[in-house]
Amino acid sequence: MRVNITLACTECGDRNYISKKNKRNNAERLELKKYCKRDKKSTLHRETK
């Protein structure tokens, strides 16, 4: 079962990315290092509800 998720920057709080994930394989919250436009650097982005 694939669901849409939103990734938010941990430093500024902006929701920069929308992605999909498989809940059966990845039950925990997703954390990825992505580029943040506001901070102009790569930061940790965490899955939000």
Curated annotation (Swiss-Prot):
GO terms for cellular component: cytoplasm; ribonucleoprotein complex; ribosome. Keywords: Ribonucleoprotein, Ribosomal protein. GO terms for biological process: translation. InterPro entries: Ribosomal_bL33, Ribosomal_bL33_CS, Ribosomal_bL33_sf, Ribosomal_zn-bd. SUPFAM superfamilies: Zn-binding ribosomal proteins. It comes from the Bacteria. One of its GO terms (molecular function) is structural constituent of ribosome. Transmembrane segments: none annotated. Belongs to the bacterial ribosomal protein bL33 family. This is Large ribosomal subunit protein bL33A.
